Structure formats: C-alpha cells, structure tokens
Amino acid sequence: GIVDFAKGVLGKIKNVLGI
C-alpha cells in the first residue's frame, strides 16, 4: 500500500544518509 511504499522510500533515504 501507500504506507508501505512511503516506509520503503524513507528506509532507502536513511540508508543513503547513513542514519
């Protein structure tokens, strides 16, 4: 769903930022 998609995007961003 939309929520799962948003969580996936946030996870990718966090990985890129090294958080």
Curated annotation (Swiss-Prot):
Cellular location(s): Secreted
A GO term from the CC aspect: extracellular region
The keyword DNA-binding is annotated on this UniProt entry: no
GO biological process, one term: defense response to bacterium
Keyword terms, alphabetized: Amphibian defense peptide, Antibiotic, Antimicrobial, Secreted
Domain of life (superkingdom): Eukaryota
Expression (tissue specificity): Expressed by the skin dorsal glands.
Primary location recorded for the protein, binned into one broad class: secreted
Described purpose of this protein according to its UniProt entry: Shows a medium antibacterial activity against M.luteus, L.mesenteriodes and S.uberis.
Protein name in the entry: Uperin-2.5
Organism, as annotated: Uperoleia inundata
Lineage, broadest ranks: Eukaryota, Metazoa, Chordata, Craniata, Vertebrata
